[in-house]
């Protein structure tokens, strides 16, 4: 059995505070491709952000995460049942789920075992949506600094699974009847302090701090300050979303 790769429990509160939010239109789209709206499963829910979005369109949402600390930081909602469970062994009833969403987490799973679990819990024609996003976009002079921080400073601390995100999960065998998804992007309006908080949520940043004993975001924030000018100024930040969407066919 593959060991759970826990990259976020140690900073679950910061993760909940500084992660970007999925657009409402994404959840509208997921409801549209779902055959019914009785039950959705938000797998690897983290702080429950996507589960709350799904709860606006589904009668019930089961939101699981292998990290108890992440579940403890999740946003409560009457329609959401939070559970500590690995993606590969959810404990959800067979053929009970209309839609599964995995947001920015598939690369941490035992992927073949997860797909087996997804097929087990999905209803006939139930949908699986896998989303990912890479490095943020602000402006060319800022993006160049962020990319250097991503590649050079924290690069050695990214686990090999990160390559799957960089290729938008395109290299993964997807054993479902695949659809051509609509394009979406996440947007936030942050000042420099909020951006620095987000960079600290990167698993590679946390591993850097653990290995080197100091926070590399302090240095990159100073460099960003030279082009940001006023650190209190709010700028628009975007993350293009990449989706792979498929339908379960039992026959």
Language-model regions: role of each:
Residues 1-13:
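N-terminal, positively charged/glycine-rich alpha-helical extensions of SAM-dependent methyltransferases
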Residues 17-38:
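Conserved alpha-helix/loop element of class I SAM-dependent methyltransferases that forms part
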Residues 41, 47-90:
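Class I SAM-dependent methyltransferase SAM/SAH-binding core
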Residues 88-99:
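A short acidic, Gly/Pro-enriched loop at the edge of an enzyme's catalytic core
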Residues 102-103, 111:
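A short beta-strand submotif of the Rossmann-like class I SAM-dependent methyltransferase core
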Residues 109-117:
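A short, conserved alpha-helix within the catalytic core of class I
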Residues 167-251:
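Conserved Class I S-adenosyl-L-methionine
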């Amino acid at each position: 059995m593959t060991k759970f790769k826990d990259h976020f429990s140690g900073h679950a509160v910061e993760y909940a505070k500084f992660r970007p939010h999925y657009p409402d239109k994404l959840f509208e789209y997921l409801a549209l491709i779902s055959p019914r709206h009785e039950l959705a499963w938000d797998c690897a829910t983290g702080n429950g952000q996507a589960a709350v979005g799904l709860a606006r369109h589904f009668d019930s949402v089961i939101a699981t995460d292998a990290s108890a600390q992440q579940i403890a930081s999740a946003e409560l909602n009457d329609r959401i049942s939070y559970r500590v469970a690995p993606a590969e062994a959810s404990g959800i009833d067979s053929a009970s789920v209309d839609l599964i969403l995995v947001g920015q987490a598939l690369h941490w799973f035992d992927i073949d075992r997860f797909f087996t679990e997804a097929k087990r819990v999905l209803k006939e024609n139930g949908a699986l949506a896998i989303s990912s996003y890479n490095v943020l976009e602000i402006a060319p002079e800022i993006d160049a600094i962020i990319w250097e921080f991503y590649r050079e400073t924290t690069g050695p601390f990214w686990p090999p699974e990160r390559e799957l995100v960089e290729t938008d999960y395109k290299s993964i065998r997807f054993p479902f009847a695949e659809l051509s998804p609509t394009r979406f992007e996440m947007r936030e309006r942050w000042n420099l302090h909020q951006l620095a908080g987000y960079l600290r949520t990167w698993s590679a940043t946390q591993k850097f701090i653990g290995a080197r004993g100091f926070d590399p975001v302090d240095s990159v924030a100073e460099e960003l300050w030279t082009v940001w000018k006023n650190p209190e100024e709010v700028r628009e930040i975007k993350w293009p979303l990449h989706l792979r969407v498929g339908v379960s066919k039992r026959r």
